[in-house]
Amino acid sequence: MPRPFQIRKVTRLPKCKSFKPVGVPRKVLEQAILALDEYEAIRLADYLKLEHLEAAEKMGISRPTFTRLIERARTKLASAIIEAKELVIEGGHIDLQSTRLRCSDCGEEQQAEPSESSQNCPECGSENVEDMKLFFTGAKHGRQRRRRGRA
């Protein structure tokens, strides 16, 4: 019997959801989907230059699992660059350690702890503030899987 899937800890969400080649219409592009845990692995190992063991501890997974995760992420990145695909960062089974809120009116973004309940924009005072986790996990804006007979 396989081990149960371990939810991965993600410290920071990306600043944007997708990257695409310039001059190619989005409708003709294939997509390479990079899950949020794969993005976090790239951020920790390649951007912050952490050793695999330290990065694995931050994500709450074993070192061998982290190594497989980073290899899968690098393969997807290489595929997106070499084959001119749109790179979309979304989804995955994650435990977000902090969250980012964005004002729908003025576009102001702020980091917040998940327990903070302030839903007003500090810049314009608007109440139209959305949790970016919903944006990246597909719960609000992304692709949602439809099942037969259910919406």
Swiss-Prot record:
State the PANTHER family in the record.
PTHR37478, UPF0251 PROTEIN TK0562
The molecule here is called UPF0251 protein Ctha_0452
* Source organism: Chloroherpeton thalassium (strain ATCC 35110 / GB-78)
The similarity annotation says: Belongs to the UPF0251 family.
Which superkingdom is the protein from? Bacteria
Coiled-coil region(s) = none
